């Protein structure tokens, strides 16, 4: 069964007939046209019958016949050759025909324009990825990705941008220029001078109770995602606890709606267990005019009614994730928002996430949450549905794997372009990407990026993979046989042999000035790197860095702990002490305050009934008897 009508015999017959008719008509016209030029008659008088009429009347004249033959042959020959080239199958080389892209191909693919991400240099022009496409850069450490990719794009990108700026190098070099046309912000929550953009993820939670749970759950999923492998119980339990605490904070008037406050709430419960603490709070609120919502109580009760060990493990897992917010610098940096992340596509805003290397592991969770929330908030509306979303957002992640795995990237990388969010992902090697996201997700990220830029790899394995990706070309190999048995000369033979377009060692020898760019639907580009400090257009834009304002922060009020319940004490007896005074002996439980002096007290200070202690009778005393005595002693203390 033929699914494509163009493959049927009748369709092919019609196509050949149409080509034949066009060939005859064009041949007649060209023959007459050229013959009239030869005999000095205006060629515009040519008709399809011109050459036929001259053959009929002057075909017997030898002088005229010669030119009639030449013009007829040319008139029919030229379109005949063109038709043959049109319908003849392209002959493919036996072992492949891989080659690098040409200037014509770059122009056809709109890579030599004036807008987009700068990827490389082609002659005097920049190779720029336009449209809504993203790119992936694989470059080893100290290979020049900063001077060749990051800084050129930060000095040329005209719209909003979010940059993961390790070492704050880009802030120092490019923030001054970007401040001339956009709002510029540096996020460094542990800056000792508190010069940081402030960002509170909870500011984007709706005040509408119907929408609030959904917004909090999104943040909870970013904070505590399910692991790719392993038991999801603990992350899920942490998310439920986070939901309950966040709803409590939102539903309590006057309470700061911050992560710091959430952490303080879960760590407060002096004088009672954490479960009892929250159970009492729920009961007190139920008796007040402002009870907690059913969703809040359900989430908290899910935590309260777990067993003691499980409850303790959930609490510890939760606080281990959010203990960052015990740091007053981080609490201050996340206590309010000084920029609205939802306006990154309606206003020109430049955000530098300027975490220093020493703080990178420590602040991984915060970077991860900020980067993910930026994507989530800007994927609520399509540009076609809101004319105010007139700018693109460049999402440039230098050291992309540093914040750890971001599930939202793995799930939405293929859709970002539709929201005018353009990712530029930079990693040290593809193996680094695979180690963080797994092979399948890493491959998805690579395939969803329209361009892949590669610097000379240090790994032999990656060099081999790049060589295979470039493909093979066919080369002529000539071999010569030596003369034998008295023959005067040998023989030469030529054969087609395959050769990689670039051998693995040639890939590793790309050097410091050349790079490869793989772009979908075209041959690989071998081009020069960009060096921003050598380009006149960029050198003019190197201005003094912007100065980030000091964050405004009001410390939360000190929380007054509930007094500990006093232990019940009761008089036991009145006796005379050594001084002859009547004193009352009371019994109370041993408290924490007694631990420091426990070794200084005598046994008479303790109310212990030793009557039940069994005395060993054997001589010598066996190990079993000693264990029995020790056990009865401990039981007496416990009683």
Q: Model segments located where?
A:
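Basic- and hydrophobic-enriched, low-structure N-terminal and domain-boundary segments
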Residues: 1-143, 147-150, 201, 472, ...
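P-loop NTPase motor domains
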Residues: 3, 26-36, 89-93, 126, ...
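General secondary-structure edge motif
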Residues: 11, 98-99, 117, 121-124, ...
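Generic recognition of cysteine residues
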Residues: 22, 71, 238, 296, ...
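Short gly/ser/thr-rich secondary-structure transition/capping motifs
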Residues: 117-122, 335, 435-436
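Conserved ATP-driven motor cores of ASCE-family P-loop NTPases powering translocation/secretion/packaging/pilus
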Residues: 413-415, 419-516
